[in-house]
Amino acid sequence: MSALGAVIALLLWGQLFAVDSGNDVMDISDDGCPKPPQIAHGYVEHSVRYQCKNYYRLRTEGDGVYTLNSEKQWINKAVGDKLPECEAVCGKPKNPANPVQRILGGHLDAKGSFPWQAKMVSRHNLTTGATLINEQWLLTTAKNLFLNHSENATAKDIAPTLTLYVGKKQLVEIEKVVLHPNYSQVDIGLIKLKQKVPVNERVMPICLPSKDYAEVGRVGYVSGWGRNANFKFTEHLKYVMLPVADQDQCVRHYEGSTVPEKKTPKSPVGVQPILNEHTFCAGMSKYQEDTCYGDAGSAFAVHDLEEDTWYAAGILSFDKSCAVAEYGVYVKVTSIQDWVQKTIAKN
């Protein structure tokens, strides 16, 4: 085969072939399949189909099939020469959480059930949580980002002081952090990684919801490396199941924490959470399971049974309850989703 004769090499039927100037397919491998036999009054059309690896899916308006035209261009009927992309699958853990896997002490052991869970370590070795929402971005709380920093710290000051792990203690490098413009009332920040993380059984983003899953009574799952009953950070990822609580009851429980002029807060944990239209509460279960210091930044993960997909309904903001208070407080993802999408697109 001359250099002028072969203009493109392609993979057909699992084997390498070449297309010459006459649009004829020639087998250029040593042990390849023979080319298809000819038929009367017909011809062989050369086409390829793009497919994605495990844990990725094809994103295209076409069907992924491209045909070689007379001008030696690979064309899809719907999108022309625009190539498809492989995007990460979200919210489809290989080993989803099983509510029967209860262990004594209230927390539940997680074995790959929450591949979106990241572990963030701030200055002075304080552990907090973060949630992977695509291959390169994570959500966490603004309070987590400001740990051991003054209120005057900037995002550029904060980013180099953080250490982040995904999957099975896989260290990833942080490029930047972005704080919500109203982070004093909307306790949220974004983390951008320097490189996209490969998605696999242990590392997978959770999906962002298209509707509000924070309905009273709905059960969600919260994972994390927060402190245990002995007030020590756990070495193993744990999770709990918690129901969404009535917001009015939650506000009454914290006794006026939304009214700044009250001088004597009466929170059962001595700290007042942010409670407003951007938050919801989840109640402690009858097994006295709860979130605790270090769990903030983790997702309130809801399993949509119809879609068999896991969504982040909220991000844990107030993790100080530790089975003392009845409610943890979460930032609604639907309240911040526009900001998240615009920030990611801008950066």
Curated annotation (Swiss-Prot):
What is a biological process (GO) this protein takes part in?
defense response to bacterium
List the GO terms this entry assigns under cellular component, sorted alphabetically.
blood microparticle
- SMART domains assigned: Tryp_SPc
Q: How does it assemble?
A: Tetramer of two alpha and two beta chains; disulfide-linked. The hemoglobin/haptoglobin complex is composed of a haptoglobin dimer bound to two hemoglobin alpha-beta dimers. Interacts with CD163. Interacts with ERGIC3.
Q: What is this protein called?
A: Haptoglobin
Q: Where in the cell is it found?
A: Secreted
Q: Where is the Sushi domain?
A: 31-88
Q: Name one Pfam family in it.
A: Trypsin
What does this chain do?
As a result of hemolysis, hemoglobin is found to accumulate in the kidney and is secreted in the urine. Haptoglobin captures, and combines with free plasma hemoglobin to allow hepatic recycling of heme iron and to prevent kidney damage. Haptoglobin also acts as an antioxidant, has antibacterial activity and plays a role in modulating many aspects of the acute phase response. Hemoglobin/haptoglobin complexes are rapidly cleared by the macrophage CD163 scavenger receptor expressed on the surface of liver Kupfer cells through an endocytic lysosomal degradation pathway.
**Domain of life according to the entry:** Eukaryota
The stretch of residues making up the signal peptide is 1-18
The text the record gives for the protein's domains is:
The beta chain mediates most of the interactions with both subunits of hemoglobin, while the alpha chain forms the homodimeric interface.
Which UniProt keyword terms apply here?
Answer: Acute phase, Antibiotic, Antimicrobial, Antioxidant, Disulfide bond, Glycoprotein, Hemoglobin-binding, Immunity, Secreted, Serine protease homolog, Signal, Sushi
